[in-house]
Amino acid sequence: MRYLFLLCALATSAAVPAQNVKVTPLGTHPGELCSRDRATIFEDPSGLRILYDAGQSVQGADDPRLGTIHVVLVSHAHGDHIGDMKLKAQGAGSCDNPELVTAAPASTSGEIAAAKNAALVMVGPMANFLAKKVETINRKATPNCPQANDTMTAPFAASCVAGVNLGGARVVKLGDGKAVEITVVPASHDSTVPRALLSEEERKHLEADNVSLQLGQPTGYVIRFSNGLVAYLTGDTGMFAEMKTTMADFHKVNFMELNLGYSALNAPAAAHIVNDLVKPATVLLSHVNEGATSGGKVKSGTHTADFLALVKGRPVYLALSGRTMELDGSGKCVAGCAAP
């Protein structure tokens, strides 16, 4: 009888699907954190797959690492996030200076959304801009994402647009799976779009006065996954008070993907955000604008190393390309947790 109970228990545990969120950075050089690395895929336990900031470190829609994508997120319209360029090939060029080719006029985000029938979830002006790119690729209008009871259900029949105002949210689920909530939150940055992605007429108007076109407000995201993980994706940003009041106090985030990027955030400021404002259980460091690693280990004398030395009381992992980490509902890394 005891053996029968054990067998039943084992069978039951084997039938329960994994309850971890899988996080996979897609960079330019396998196993490294390099200067142009931006893209990250988040896979909910339900199977819903979200691509965040495709940028320039993917090879466009044909990148074999992408797999199924249900939702495309873009934090702001800078070329390294919306994707005015794309990676020529995995490992092309150096980690500091990868070899890129143009992704104009479509952008990597537009290409991928069109090819994967993905929902564009972002602030309205940028969602509409990318919806037009998808329309050009598909040769038909990009519809609004269908909803029932304020919930979008993937997979979608075609790429669709789901614009969100700052502070608003979209709820998405895969089939009959549990829902994932995606909230658009502030960032302290700008959101100017590369002229290469604009029409010739628009470029001429802007070039005459050397001005830029901004596609709405720059943002970050808070994603509440079905296992309880609450992830804060900062986007490009400086420090601001809502990191504590909104992200920590209200959303109670327990995981943070932090963009370092010295034009917006230096190591001491970034460490203060982590240690004193947001206080997540775990940090994933990305967008470092330097070849930060060699053999997957952080190089001394880098801004990345400076930041790591200042963070206290929680693990920081590097967004090493192709290395999947798994996070439980509390924000703890439980698999693929390589030390920097």
Description of each model-found segment:
Residues 209-268:
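Metallo-beta-lactamase
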Residues 42-45, 174-176, 223-227:
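Active-site beta-strand termini and strand-to-loop segments that position acidic
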Residues 18-19:
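Boundary of Sec targeting at the N-terminus
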Residues 28-111, 191-212, 237-251:
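Pre-active-site segment of Zn-dependent metallo-hydrolases
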Residues 111-176, 271-340:
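Binuclear metal-ion centers of metallo-dependent hydrolases, dominated by the metallo-beta-lactamase
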Residues 51-55, 69-85, 121-124, 232-237, ...:
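Active-site neighborhood of phospho(di)ester-bond hydrolases with catalytic His/Asp-centered motifs
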Residues 11-13:
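N-terminal signal peptide c-region/cleavage motif recognized by signal peptidases
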Residues 31-36, 58-59, 78-83, 122, ...:
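Active-site environment of divalent metal-dependent phosphoester hydrolases
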